[in-house]
Structures are given as structure tokens and as C-alpha cells.
Amino acid sequence: MLYWLNELSDGGDVFNLFRYITFRAGGAFFTALIFGFIFGQPLINALRRKYKDGQPIREVGPAHETKAGTPTMGGLLILAALSLATLLWARLDNPYVWLVLGVTWCFGLIGFADDWAKVSRNSSAGVSGKVRLAIGFVVAFGAALIAAWVHPEELSNQLAMPVFKDVLLNMGWMYVPFVMIVIVGSANAVNLTDGLDGLAIMPVMIAAGTLGVIAYAVGRVDFTDYLDVHYVPGTGELLIFTAGLIGGGLGFLWYNAPPAAVFMGDTGSLALGGALGAIAVCTKHEIVLAIVGGLFVAEAVSVIVQVLYFKATGKRVFLMAPIHHHFEKKGWAEPQVVIRFWIISLILALIGLATLKLR
């Protein structure tokens, strides 16, 4: 919205700054951060009044018993902060901005319904997993069709291969189901990761920051020529979305830091995971998402392996899944698990960024 202030510029005044994506990304970051700081505590108070029992806690160990009564749905704070920041600072005539916002809010609503079902029944059983997956795939199907439509014709239905120069794999009709798997898989992988105080939000912010840099790079023809990557005009505006996500995420982390005063719930985890998947699709960096979000992949794979192996043999591979609970069972303190997983996320993000140059 504020982008249009640049039309008031004569070329040498403050209004000219609104032309620049980097300036507006900074504005989005601070807008979301300040919003989170201001409205975080009022939201927590409102959630405590509305849902006195808080989120039902899975019985993992004695350390988790103290979390009973902690309010959930804190993802609403992140969603509101990043949406306000994006609507204020991004170009609203950009289809990628609306695509990512739409996916984020649709998955946020799926998560909200699940959170509401849990707290209203005071049960860890929310909306059926099959129902959530079905709705998620419908949303992702719509996103895939829109992405194929808004991408340049030479990139539509193409899968970019990292490291290799200008290598695109034409997926044809398989592109749509592939995108559906990327978005739904990303949403649910982040959801599985959100099991400890602060565990999910920092890796999400790291991944978002990395994808934001990639979106900015592939949205500039000079950068793509230098890096030998495909050019996707318009994706640079997604840097503003990711900046708002990071600002809102930090505002949320202020209250989610151990011991957490609020959980993001499925409202936040599904929304943020869906957002990461949508950004990867828009920028044609779906494979890089698997690297940058490798922690989320590991969490999801640990659950799949645990379930399949148990059904086949009656035995477990891990002491408990997702894998962060396995390390808790091994004797790691919760802060150890969280911070070590943050470090892993940062390393994976650097590897993901390196794929831009390693060609």
C-alpha cells in the first residue's frame, strides 16, 4: 500500500525510498515486530480468559506437566502481524504476494479450527487428521493452479534443479500434484516440529529469511544473470512478506521463549509451514526448501518411519516421535534440544543459500 507513495516523489525526497524493496522490507519487519510486542500480552490475556484450561498437553515427561494451562492459538499474533506488515508495505498488485498470503491464511484457518476443537473439548483430539489433510490438499490444488498461471510461460510446470546451470525439468501434468505435496508437506512438517518452547518458530524464521533472500535474488534480472539462475519477475516482493514473518515471529518468540506464556498452536504452525511451501513454489526453489527446511523434513520423516516400522514389526525405531522427543527421552534438556535444533537450521540455511552460487 505504502509503495504508491513513491508516485509523490520528484526523485530526490523521502517518498522515493518507497520504490525500494529493501526499504519496504525493513518497514515490514519493524511494523510486525512492534505489533507483536504491543498486542502479544493482550492476546495472551484474552486467550486465558476465553480458554482457561489452555492447550491439552501430550504426556512426554515430568517437564511437560508444568505446561498445562498454557494458552494456544498464539499463531494469531504472527498471522495478524505479518498480514498487516505485508498489506502496508508490499505492492498489492503483485500476484505472488496474494498467493502466499492466501495459502498462509487458509492453512491458518485449518489450524485454528483444530485448536478450537481441542480447547473447547479440553482434549488433544481436534479435527480429524484426514479432514485436515483433505482440506489442505484442496487449498494446495488451488495454489498450484494459480502458480502455474502467474509464472512466466517458460517456467510454468517446470522444476528448477539447484546447483546445475539453467536446468529445468518439465513436469507437465505432474507439476500440480507435486506442488500440492510441497505445500501440504511443508505445513504438516512444521506442525510436527512445534512440540517444544521456541523450537519451531526460530527455524521457521531462518527458513523464511533464506527464502526471502532467494525470492529477492530471482526477482532481479541482474542477480539472476550473475548467479545463472532462472528469472521470476515479481518474486522480490516476497522479501517483504518474509520480513513481516520474521518480525512477527520475533514478537511471538518474546512470549514463547521458555517457559512459554503462549503456544502458536496449529493456527501458527500450519500457516507458517504453508507459507514456506508457497514461497518455494513461487520462486521455483521447491528442492532448496527441502534443504533449508531440512529440520522439518527430519521431524516428519521420523514420524513416518516410526509409524511404518511399528506397524511392520511391532517395534520402534525412536524412543518417541517426532525426533525432538526422542532426544528428550535420551536425557537432553528441553533448552538443549531447542538450541541445537536452531543451530542445525542455521547450517542448513547457509547450505541452501550456497546453492545459489554453486553452479
UniProtKB/Swiss-Prot annotation:
Pathway: Cell wall biogenesis; peptidoglycan biosynthesis. GO terms for biological process: cell division; cell wall organization; peptidoglycan biosynthetic process; regulation of cell shape. GO terms for cellular component: plasma membrane. Its main location: membrane. Keywords: Cell cycle, Cell division, Cell inner membrane, Cell membrane, Cell shape, Cell wall biogenesis/degradation, Magnesium, Membrane, Metal-binding, Peptidoglycan synthesis, Transferase, Transmembrane, Transmembrane helix. It is found in: Cell inner membrane. It catalyses: UDP-N-acetyl-alpha-D-muramoyl-L-alanyl-gamma-D-glutamyl-meso-2,6-diaminopimeloyl-D-alanyl-D-alanine + di-trans,octa-cis-undecaprenyl phosphate = di-trans,octa-cis-undecaprenyl diphospho-N-acetyl-alpha-D-muramoyl-L-alanyl-D-glutamyl-meso-2,6-diaminopimeloyl-D-alanyl-D-alanine + UMP. The chain crosses the membrane at residues 27-47, 70-90, 97-117, 133-153, 167-187, 198-218, 238-258, 261-281, 287-307, 336-356. Its EC number is 2.7.8.13. Its cofactor is Mg(2+). CDD domains: GT_MraY. Pfam families: Glycos_transf_4 (PF00953), MraY_sig1 (PF10555). It is a multi-pass membrane protein. GO terms for molecular function: metal ion binding; phospho-N-acetylmuramoyl-pentapeptide-transferase activity; UDP-N-acetylmuramoyl-L-alanyl-D-glutamyl-meso-2,6-diaminopimelyl-D-alanyl-D-alanine:undecaprenyl-phosphate transferase activity. InterPro entries: Glycosyl_transferase_4, PNAcMuramoyl-5peptid_Trfase, PNAcMuramoyl-5peptid_Trfase_CS. Belongs to the glycosyltransferase 4 family. MraY subfamily. NCBIfam families: mraY. Catalyzes the initial step of the lipid cycle reactions in the biosynthesis of the cell wall peptidoglycan: transfers peptidoglycan precursor phospho-MurNAc-pentapeptide from UDP-MurNAc-pentapeptide onto the lipid carrier undecaprenyl phosphate, yielding undecaprenyl-pyrophosphoryl-MurNAc-pentapeptide, known as lipid I. This is Phospho-N-acetylmuramoyl-pentapeptide-transferase.
